[in-house]
């Protein structure tokens, strides 16, 4: 094969392995790196199993999670792949979005079929917005009976359909991660087939820069003779000088204003883009008209809300969370982007209480409106200490 130099122009996609314990997620992750290393040695280092298995700890929204990150390239793409050692780590990662996934490889053992955690991961993927799934039917070398393989495949497709994924169309590839890792050529080829399916059916994500402008306000100050400046990190989109923007959230009404200047590191710019830390000079706005916790956005792109449904993970006491359960009408603070807002919790029908370490659905009513859309993530705090994390699954009011 001709030498290829690393092309930064390749599209970048974030994926991860999900599925039941011991169905082979970590083995598959290692095997993918091996097979791609063998196919494109200049592009891919091989990452052995034990290196992925002892995943380093990270913090996301005050929650500690073990996540292993590996990267590799196919012919057409560059991938960042996440794998979590424990079931709880998966749940925490998916809810906090510590490692965002543009798509997932659902690993199902052909010897067991879908198991309880298979279902839980698929449900979470649906709720937290993992948009695409490809199935690796693993340990296929251990099943001689073609009919059994077909039945398991059917079961997986039905499971995906029941959670509103396109079960009939999702690629299902029969693999043996262990055999591929051991260097078996035929099973290695099946993994290349799996990655071709990932290339093909997990589309490129829309880049932050292409989405409507949004910047959470971190600080507000006055520059004598020039006006009010708000600072923050642009979360998405682009803001240009002389554009009209809206200030949304916290206060009952949304305010419209014009950006008369964009500054970064004391220099004047024409625009601020996703990822930039900038100061925006706003026309006709008084210091007391804006506050931390509001967002500056492209007009009409987002609205303020107080009532929503969410999927949450509640820390256990070893993670620094609560020592006792909570009940309906629990009133913690919900930390959105840059600020805390108190909210009242309603639990789902039939749920009396939520124990530390649980993940659950809930409805929340905030005492102040927040610029909100489905998919927005938050932390749950009591007096500045994180006790949980969640994601808005549905805006109600």
UniProtKB/Swiss-Prot annotation:
Its EC number is 3.6.5.3. Residues 176-178 are annotated as: G5. Belongs to the TRAFAC class translation factor GTPase superfamily. Classic translation factor GTPase family. EF-Tu/EF-1A subfamily. One of its GO terms (molecular function) is translation elongation factor activity. The keyword Lyase does not apply. PANTHER family: ELONGATION FACTOR TU, MITOCHONDRIAL (PTHR43721:SF22), ELONGATION FACTOR TU-RELATED (PTHR43721). It comes from Frankia casuarinae (strain DSM 45818 / CECT 9043 / HFP020203 / CcI3). Monomer. Residues 83-86 are annotated as: G3. It is found in: Cytoplasm. This is Elongation factor Tu. Residues 10-206 form the tr-type G domain. GTP binds at residues 19-26, 83-87, 138-141. It holds the Pfam family GTP_EFTU. The keyword Magnesium applies. Its main location: cytoplasm. HAMAP family: EF_Tu_B (MF_00118_B). GTP hydrolase that promotes the GTP-dependent binding of aminoacyl-tRNA to the A-site of ribosomes during protein biosynthesis. Keywords: Cytoplasm, Elongation factor, GTP-binding, Hydrolase, Magnesium, Metal-binding, Nucleotide-binding, Protein biosynthesis. Mg(2+) binds at residue 26. It catalyses: GTP + H2O = GDP + phosphate + H(+). Residues 62-66 are annotated as: G2. PROSITE patterns: G_TR_1, G_TR_2. InterPro entries: EF-Tu_GTP-bd, EF-Tu_GTPase, EFTu-like_2, EFTU_2, G_TR_CS, P-loop_NTPase, Small_GTP-bd, T_Tr_GTP-bd_dom. GO terms for cellular component: cytosol.
């Amino acid at each position: 094969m001709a030498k290829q130099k690393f092309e930064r122009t390749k599209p970048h996609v974030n994926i991860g392995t999900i599925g039941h314990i011991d169905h082979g997620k970590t083995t598959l992750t290692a095997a993918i790196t091996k097979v791609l290393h063998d196919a494109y040695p200049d592009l891919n280092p091989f990452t052995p199993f034990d290196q992925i298995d002892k995943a380093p700890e990270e913090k996301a929204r005050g929650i500690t999670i073990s996540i292993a990150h590996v990267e590799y390239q196919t012919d057409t793409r560059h991938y960042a792949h996440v794998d979590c050692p424990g079931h709880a780590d998966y749940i925490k990662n998916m809810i906090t979005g510590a490692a965002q996934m543009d798509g997932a490889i659902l690993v199902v053992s052909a010897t067991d079929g879908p198991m309880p955690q298979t279902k839980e991961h698929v449900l979470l993927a649906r709720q937290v917005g993992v948009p695409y799934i490809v199935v690796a039917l693993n340990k296929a070398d251990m099943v001689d009976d073609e009919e059994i393989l077909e039945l398991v495949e059917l079961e997986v497709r039905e499971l995906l359909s029941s959670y509103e994924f396109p079960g009939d169309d999702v690629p299902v590839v029969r693999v043996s991660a262990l055999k591929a890792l051991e260097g078996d050529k035929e099973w290695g080829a099946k993994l290349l087939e799996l990655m071709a399916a990932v290339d093909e059916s997990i589309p490129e994500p829309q880049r932050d820069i292409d989405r409507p402008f949004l910047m959470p306000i971190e600080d507000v100050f006055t520059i004598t003779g020039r006006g009010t400046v708000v600072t923050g990190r642009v979360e998405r989109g682009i803001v240009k000088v002389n554009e009209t923007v809206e200030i949304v959230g916290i206060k009952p009404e949304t305010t419209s204003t014009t950006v008369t200047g964009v500054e970064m590191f004391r220099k004047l710019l024409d625009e601020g883009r996703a990822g930039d830390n900038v100061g925006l000079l706003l026309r006709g706005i008084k210091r007391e008209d804006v506050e931390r916790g509001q967002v500056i956005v492209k007009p009409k792109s987002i609205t303020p809300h107080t009532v929503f449904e969410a999927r949450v993970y509640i820390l256990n006491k070893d993670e620094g969370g609560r020592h006792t359960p909570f009940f309906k009408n629990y009133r913690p603070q919900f930390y959105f982007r840059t600020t805390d807002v108190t909210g009242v919790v309603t639990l789902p029908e039939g749920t009396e209480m939520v124990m530390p370490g649980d993940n659950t659905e809930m409805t929340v009513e905030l005492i102040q409106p927040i610029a909100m859309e489905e998919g927005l993530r938050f932390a749950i705090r009591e007096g500045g200490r994180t006790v949980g994390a969640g994601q808005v699954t549905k805006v109600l009011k």
